[in-house]
Amino acid sequence: MTDEKHVYVPPPKDPPSYEEVALHSALNNSAPPNDGEQNETSMEEMEIIEPPSEDSSRFPLLRTKLAAIHEGWESACHSFEIRFASTFHRIPFQFLYLAVIATVIILASYYGYFDGVPAWRSVHHYGEDVLLNYIKGCDISDTRQQVMTLSSIPHLAGTVGDSSLLQMIMNRLYYEKGTIVDFREFYAYLNFPQLVSLSIDGDDSFHPSLIESYQVGGYDGVSIPTPATFGGSPSGFVNAPLVYANRGRIEDFEWLVNSGIYVESSIVLVRANQSDFALATANAEKYNASAILIFEDTYLTSLDNLNQVYPAGPYPSANSLYRGSVANHYYYVGDPLTPGWSAHEETNRISPKDANVLPSIVSIPITFNDGIELLKRLQGHGHLVKDSNWCQDLAPVLSEVWTGSKISSPGLEVNVLQDIEDKQKIINIMAQIDGYESDQILVVGAPRDSWCTGASDSSVGTSLLIDVISTFANMAQDLSWKPRRTIVFASWDARQFNAIGSTEFLEYWKESLEAKAVAYINVDVAVSGDTFTARTVPGLKKVIQRAFDVANEEDEMKAANIITDDFDYTSDLTSFLTFAGIPVVNLAFERNEENPTPMPFLGSCEDTVSWIDTFGSEYWENAARLGKIWSYLILFLANDPVVPYDLEDEINGVGEMLKRIPEIPGANALDLRKINEEFSELLESLIRFEDEIREWKSLMMHNSYTVSVKKHPELEGYNAKLARFERSFLDEAGLPGHEWYKHLIYGPNLRNSHSQLFPSIFDALLYGDVEAAQKEVKRIALALDRAHNEIRFA
């Protein structure tokens, strides 16, 4: 990172206190301990004993051998002088002098003498067991109390609450010695609701709940109103008939059209979970709807647990509002007006009309109760739906499901007034612990902002991030320790608005991070179940399992669930993986099918500590476990001499993914021979590369944590190749139709919100364009060739 872009400015060191000066003076003037007096006396006696003289009769045999060696040396020097003296006399002395100096400089530079650590001195690293024991001994702070503080007020990005939380965290981190703490500002497109209203023409009995009020703790009668809103929604006034479109998928809109129900110029009602808000909105816009109303149907999980509905238990009520972003992340994430470059205050921006991530239709979230009330108003209008995909799970709360129609449906009036800021300041908090290898960086992050109070949706992750920073800062201070690689910690702002904070950071530092970053570790919704789950690339599976196993020694858990083909592309890891090709990990405790616990109330003002408490102590115990696993993983990725990116796992994982290309609908028309050939060559290169690393380890790494970083240029070469390997699958031309995404293996797709392997092939075949799909096959083959060349000349 160049000097003019250096984010982290260390604060000036404080002068020593009087106590420190007095202690230093006392130590210098104190007498040595009694148990060392005998050793010191012996040393003094040894120092004054004179060495034996040349006439001494000691060691006669040794003296005879040394004399013979001396005579041989004298003879060799005399012979060399006779043969070559005349030649050297003809070379000017200055040239010989310069040649010697140049040789010394080249060798010194090669072995790192001019780098941060002298070549003659090993970089001291504590044994792994010492560092692990230190982390094990670190007490996690009272996470519940810390989360209660962090979630005490709503803190949407760009608001006063977010600013207060920022200051609170900055003040907390400034006390951590050994870290450099600073912040980085960006200026992004954000919207803030001023007015939201919804009514039915001629029906005064419909009173939707469009505002949630959060009761401020410790202040009786003081509450903060939070309107229903979606990030990215424009202002607008619409009066139009209502049409129901099930879950807002493409197939749902196609079914309506095939049934003679057209949604053009209508208000569409859909039920969708938070990950599908943006896709449902994009599909409604594609079919020319004028507005969209979205309700979450997670309340259906409460029907069998009505005695456990919050606040009596963890299940959602029918009156919860779930906010989210409707920015279409299929095209890109980050600031809508600066795609591909960082959003500084004076940078060039595109028009909001040209930002294809921003929808042009009005959208608002509504409660489950209000959604059902609107469906009841549609009964008798349009078509009676009998498709089980549309109505089966609604049967307990709705006798019939009708589509509604443009002709006969009741008219709705939707009014949304947004305060839209093109350049709203957002702030990432950064902390850094410098490592010995300044050319390698590990990035660690968690989002900070939330739609409301966000206890589970950001505050738990933020609390754990603070604890992790504290652990490593204290370890650096107490042990005078430095990690091998620099660790950059980040508290991201504006994650809820399409992952803006992390993306702008990545876009600003892209060139440097592509060259230096070994991995990015993300924690978002830290706990939503009881199974430790890591979503990552195949090359990091082993090191994640290793971190989990260490934590499992202290506190036995269920088996870890490590997933390598499914990412959330609305999260902060998106830009690192798909835009810059940096290996990523997302850590969390998630739900599983065996124990489908209720999901957190993401985006709702009911996402509070009191809701978390309905789970009992297990939630907080899992949060503490996650903090330990996170710390161990950071240690391994930042401190192992060889970057723990397992190339064999990575390549074998890619091979398994390649086998799934024929499973894509329409892929039987593709010629995949070139991909298979390139992958076979990649496997051959892998064998040679792994052999070289094994040979190096056997020769040099007798103690893996006491190895000179600068004595082994081979190690630097291996690590650089391992860190760059994931970048082989980037293509700067981008994916057709959403060129911001560069990774050919991972990315979003047009059809649904789920992660899609080889998305460009999927999208091309979705439209029946076999020729375009074959071009994507060729690009993937070229990426495999780049990967092969990356490790071929190890």
Curated annotation (Swiss-Prot):
InterPro entries: PA_dom_sf, Peptidase_M28, Peptidase_M28B, TFR-like_dimer_dom, TFR-like_dimer_dom_sf
Domain of life: Eukaryota
Listed GO CC annotations: fungal-type vacuole membrane
Region described as Disordered: spans on this chain: 1-56
Entry's transmembrane regions: 91-111
Gene3D superfamilies, alphabetized: 3.50.30.30, Transferrin receptor-like, dimerisation domain, Zn peptidases
Keywords on record: Membrane, Transmembrane, Transmembrane helix
Coiled coil: none
Organism annotation: Schizosaccharomyces pombe (strain 972 / ATCC 24843)
Gene Ontology biological process terms from the UniProt entry: protein transport to vacuole involved in ubiquitin-dependent protein catabolic process via the multivesicular body sorting pathway
One term of GO molecular function: carboxypeptidase activity
Predominant location category: membrane
The keyword Membrane is assigned to this record: yes
Membrane topology: Single-pass membrane protein
Family: Belongs to the peptidase M28 family. M28B subfamily.
Intracellular or extracellular location(s): Membrane
Protein name according to UniProt: Inactive zinc metalloprotease C354.09c
